[in-house]
């Protein structure tokens, strides 16, 4: 960590098709081994399928799905006097987005559908309907924070 001043976060260019920075970030999360064009085609195919299925605008459906997966609280380990407590803390907005994207991609990779575009479309569709693995992960994190609410005074 720098001592003098905080570092400006690197600006991310919006994606070429929709002009959304959020979608560009999602493409980067999905990307493997620097193969961005493949990641873009997977995301765009998935969004096309999602738009046909939901009847909404592709970007709007994507944002609804992302909103349903974003966590508001999480637990962090804090060591106090020889024992470790899981302390619930609020999640920063940038981290909320990052976690939601990561969870959606992880859940899509674990699915058993044919192509990655199909898996991603199905996971985004499930997330938009408040079901699926990514939403379950968010609920588990919230449940863990709720269970450890007694240790909230250890916050830093």
From Swiss-Prot:
<comment type="similarity">
    <text>Belongs to the universal ribosomal protein uS7 family.</text>
</comment>
<comment type="subunit">
    <text>Part of the 30S ribosomal subunit. Contacts proteins S9 and S11.</text>
</comment>
<dbReference type="InterPro" id="IPR036823">
    <property type="entry name" value="Ribosomal_uS7_dom_sf"/>
</dbReference>
<keyword id="KW-0694">RNA-binding</keyword>
<dbReference type="GO" id="GO:0019843">
    <property type="term" value="F:rRNA binding"/>
</dbReference>
<dbReference type="GO" id="GO:0006412">
    <property type="term" value="P:translation"/>
</dbReference>
<dbReference type="InterPro" id="IPR020606">
    <property type="entry name" value="Ribosomal_uS7_CS"/>
</dbReference>
<keyword id="KW-0699">rRNA-binding</keyword>
<protein>
    <recommendedName>
        <fullName>Small ribosomal subunit protein uS7</fullName>
    </recommendedName>
</protein>
<comment type="function">
    <text>One of the primary rRNA binding proteins, it binds directly to 16S rRNA where it nucleates assembly of the head domain of the 30S subunit. Is located at the subunit interface close to the decoding center, probably blocks exit of the E-site tRNA.</text>
</comment>
<dbReference type="InterPro" id="IPR005717">
    <property type="entry name" value="Ribosomal_uS7_bac/org-type"/>
</dbReference>
<dbReference type="GO" id="GO:0015935">
    <property type="term" value="C:small ribosomal subunit"/>
</dbReference>
<dbReference type="GO" id="GO:0000049">
    <property type="term" value="F:tRNA binding"/>
</dbReference>
<keyword id="KW-0820">tRNA-binding</keyword>
<dbReference type="InterPro" id="IPR000235">
    <property type="entry name" value="Ribosomal_uS7"/>
</dbReference>
<keyword id="KW-0689">Ribosomal protein</keyword>
<dbReference type="Pfam" id="PF00177">
    <property type="entry name" value="Ribosomal_S7"/>
</dbReference>
<dbReference type="GO" id="GO:0003735">
    <property type="term" value="F:structural constituent of ribosome"/>
</dbReference>
<dbReference type="InterPro" id="IPR023798">
    <property type="entry name" value="Ribosomal_uS7_dom"/>
</dbReference>
<keyword id="KW-0687">Ribonucleoprotein</keyword>
